[in-house]
Amino acid sequence: MRYVDFVDLRYEPKGTDVLCTFNVEPEGVSVEEAAGGVAAESSIGTWTELTTVKPYVEKLAARVFDIERNSIKIAYPIELFEPRNMPNILSSVSGNVFGLRTLKNLRLNDIHFPSELVRSFKGPKYGVAGIRRILRVYERPLVGTIIKPKLGLKTLDHSRVAYEAWVGGCDIVKDDENLSSQRFNPFENRVVKTLESRDRAEEETGARKVYMVNITAETNEMLKRAEFVLDHGGEYVMVDILTCGFSALQTLRQQDFDLVVHAHRAGHAAFTKNAKHGISMRVIAKIARIIGVDQLHVGTIVGKMFEARGEVAENCDALKKEMSGLRRVLPVASGGLHPGLVPALIKFFRKDFVIQAGGGIHGHRDGTIAGAKAMRQAVDATLKGVPLSEYAETYRELETALKMWGQQA
């Protein structure tokens, strides 16, 4: 089969097909030829016609069924893929095709998985509803922080910062993505001491608190760390899902630990930042949800990591829209957030998300407790419909934060 034979604009996708939307930028060929090349090389074809192709093999050919300028849609028969094997799926639809000579750029913008494939994975164990049950917080966004500085603190200082964030009002404290088990803060010591701080904060505040400890490591070591967290009364683990890999994530989820899985997307921009080439965050979010994370960083519309509103909305939709009965995943907004940005965040995300602030809490000139209080005060003010500037007349922590960083409506 020639590349153009994989283009069939009359084809109507079946309910069992895997559907991919690509943006193609051809190099020296037509869009149709480039599109056919993507479909061929990601299914049964190659650069020349073959004598070994049988009629039953031709039935497995991917089909380009829609072309609109440079946006193409390809349908893949489900028989091309092994259930419960995400590497197999991605090696086809996002593998060698990115290196084709006839393509200047290629971007996988969206993917639809049929129910049969979705249900072969475990999916989220807790999701939005389960997380809210654990924390007993139902009507507001969750407030979290990342221990700062991200690296360098010794274990006791790390646990002390966590304690201050919790008593100040944070629901969640998490490790940063590059803290694992360095000499200055070994994993097991950190888990024990920080969970002790959590227990003390819960006793003093009467509120539930959780610690997201980063267990990212070689897969077997990661499983050992998850068991250690569970054995010591932890309820959450954090995984850098792209650097440890989807297979490691799936192995973790298949253990069915009674642990909420928080997914950090460190490294995503290597795939997502170039709007013409790579893989969209929406695709990554769908894959993470299917495999089984419970909450995931999705970007934010403000702060140092801000992204286009439409893109962040698509990421949230990938986590929350109906998908073969999977639980909804809780979006996490993070990156340069502070109390003055809370109204804009809540207006966009509504209530079901995590406000994850590091410097915007620990950078408060009066310390971490004051920074956490200011963030909670900003949330309370916004939900009450009171302008932050007016609320700050009563709450000095918020007043100081607004003077330091300003505010955005």
Model regions and ranges:
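Phosphate-/polyanion-interacting regions in eukaryotic proteins
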Residues: 43-49, 53-121
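Alpha-helix-loop-beta-strand connector modules within alpha/beta enzyme cores
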Residues: 42-47, 186-213, 246-267, 311-328, ...
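N-terminal small/glycine-rich loop or linker at the start of catalytic domains
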Residues: 123-153, 199-208, 257-271
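Short Lys/Arg-enriched alpha/beta "domain-start" segment
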Residues: 1-53
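Catalytic alpha/beta core domains of metabolic enzymes, predominantly
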Residues: 224-227, 232, 236-357
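Active-site mouth loops of central-metabolism enzymes
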Residues: 22-29, 141-159, 209-221, 267-279
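Extended, intrinsically disordered, low-complexity segments
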Residues: 367-409
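Active-site-adjacent beta->alpha loops and helix N-cap segments on the catalytic face
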Residues: 124-132, 180-201, 219-222, 241-257, ...
